[in-house]
Design a protein with these regions (language model features):
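Helix-rich interaction surfaces within compact, conserved domain-sized segments
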Residues: 128-141, 146-154
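Mid-chain, well-packed structural core segment of small domains
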Residues: 106-136
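Transmembrane beta-barrel strands of outer-membrane/channel proteins
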Residues: 48-52, 68, 79-85, 99, ...
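Outer-membrane beta-barrel "beta-signal"
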Residues: 164-178
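Solvent-exposed loop/turn segments connecting transmembrane beta-strands
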Residues: 52-62, 83-94, 121-128, 158-166
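Residues on the lipid-exposed face of transmembrane beta-strands in outer-membrane beta-barrel proteins
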Residues: 64-70, 95-101, 112-114, 135-139, ...
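Repeated loop/turn-to-beta-strand initiation elements of outer-membrane beta-barrel proteins
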Residues: 73-78, 105-108, 143-149
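Cleavable N-terminal export/targeting peptides
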Residues: 1-39, 178
């Protein structure tokens, strides 16, 4: 700390102000980045969803979805598991990863999952193994609940000769769990 003597004719209050102006700035400790500082406080979420299965084809059905998104692992990546069913008795159990990108109150979430599919009386997707690529846009309320729209594509990625794929548009409500 560097200070210069002040003349005695300057009042003490002005002397203190002048001394603080000419002091050398204090050194700050170096910034340390750890895994903990890269984490956010996003909770786990339970999502309930309903929508329209096979929106681009003639075998449409109602879609219902239950999904558990775990707390962030790191860099805004969430692992998740889910179960989707349709009014045609198709069932899809899956697990994957999602990435939250927040812009104000809106959350954009691309995700990818793999799982097992049973067609029931619905559309034959060609293989039991199916992959899901999705984009969700949600509004996050002050209490951290989210209301969002998700569009996703299911496909077996040509694991079988028959690979018609399907698209789903669904509305979801996500409830936070700390």
């Amino acid at each position: 700390q560097l200070a210069f003597p002040m003349p005695t004719s300057i009042p003490a209050s002005k002397s203190a102000a002048a001394t603080s102006i000419i002091r050398a700035p204090a050194k700050k400790p170096p910034v340390q980045v750890s895994q903990a500082s890269l984490r956010s406080d996003d909770p786990s979420y339970l999502t309930l969803g309903a929508g329209y299965y096979d929106i681009n084809d003639n075998q449409g059905a109602a879609e219902f979805r239950l999904e558990w998104r775990f707390k962030e692992m790191f860099w805004k990546i969430h692992p998740f598991v889910g179960l989707m069913g349709t009014s045609d008795a198709a069932v899809y159990g899956y697990g994957g990863i999602a990435f939250d990108w927040k812009l104000g109150k809106f959350v954009f979430t691309p995700s990818f999952a793999a799982g097992a599919y049973r067609d029931g009386d619905g559309k034959d997707l060609g293989h039991v193994i199916e992959f899901r690529s999705a984009l969700e846009i949600a509004y996050e309320f002050d209490n951290r609940h989210r209301l969002g729209l998700i569009f996703y594509h299911l496909s077996n990625a040509s694991l079988a000769d028959n690979n018609p794929g399907t698209e789903v548009l669904s509305l979801g409500y996500s409830i936070p769990f700390d």
